[in-house]
């Protein structure tokens, strides 16, 4: 992993480690470095580290975009849910934005997400967890979400990728 000398313990975190300069990334790297130095198993999947921009609407991202997935040799499958189709977003009067999920068409593996929506900084964590656990687009589509909530848009984007959406036109 990043910050790990060949065959040695993970020993770099935060500003001296590669990748984006995010406080939550530095904290996770620090914990992994301490565990590694102590001889404990330490793993950190950098693909599952989310980022957020606190604008209006917020922006959340984790993992790969469709273009990054293509460049990495995947055959991407993409699903999108516009927030204007979200009942909860409509009740907030904040229906600008979308949830977009990216997966691998061959395996269904969840590769990333981009969210532009109210509370995107909160919503993106579900996809980070999915990436960390090796979830598929189908796993996300099959996860029952409370109605009406903003997080339903993640499930609906997965359903859209699988051409099973009921609140949007399928891709």
Where are these regions (language model features)?
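Flexible, glycine-rich terminal cap/loop adjacent to redox cofactors
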Residues: 38, 54-171
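Internal hydrophobic alpha-helix adjacent to the cofactor/substrate pocket in enzyme cavities
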Residues: 24-48, 74-75, 133
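Histidine (H) residue identity feature
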Residues: 9, 24, 46, 145-147, ...
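FAD-site-proximal beta/loop scaffold in flavoenzymes
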Residues: 1-36, 122, 130
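Helix-loop-beta segment of a Rossmann-like dinucleotide-binding subdomain
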Residues: 49-53
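Short beta-turn/strand-loop junction motif enriched in small, turn-promoting residues
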Residues: 18, 46-47, 86
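Structured loop/turn residues at beta-strand edges in well-structured enzyme cores
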Residues: 5-8, 47, 135
